[in-house]
From Swiss-Prot:
One of its GO terms (molecular function) is structural constituent of ribosome. GO terms for biological process: translation. This is Large ribosomal subunit protein uL29. Belongs to the universal ribosomal protein uL29 family. The gene is rpmC. SUPFAM superfamilies: Ribosomal protein L29 (L29p). Coiled coil: none annotated. PROSITE patterns: RIBOSOMAL_L29 (PS00579). It comes from the Bacteria. The keyword Repeat does not apply. Keywords: Ribonucleoprotein, Ribosomal protein.
Length: 66
């Protein structure tokens, strides 16, 4: 998901997506440890998506405080 798409969502929706992505990341890491993961690049994609979403949330927090 691109940053522009994330900015269109509400903060609550973003937080919900972060939660689901963290669960997916946990499962991907578990699959990696057990040797079942085929697409290892997916871990990187999920981590970057979480970071993008957290960045948008933080930008909103800072813009409200200023």
């Amino acid at each position: 998901m691109k940053a522009n798409e994330i900015r269109d969502l509400t903060t609550a929706e973003i937080e919900q997506k972060v939660k689901s992505l963290k669960e997916e990341l946990f499962n991907l890491r578990f699959q990696l440890a057990t040797g079942q993961l085929e697409n290892t690049a997916r871990i990187r994609e999920v981590r970057k998506s979480i970071a993008r979403m957290k960045t948008v949330i933080r930008q909103r927090e800072l813009s409200v405080n200023n």
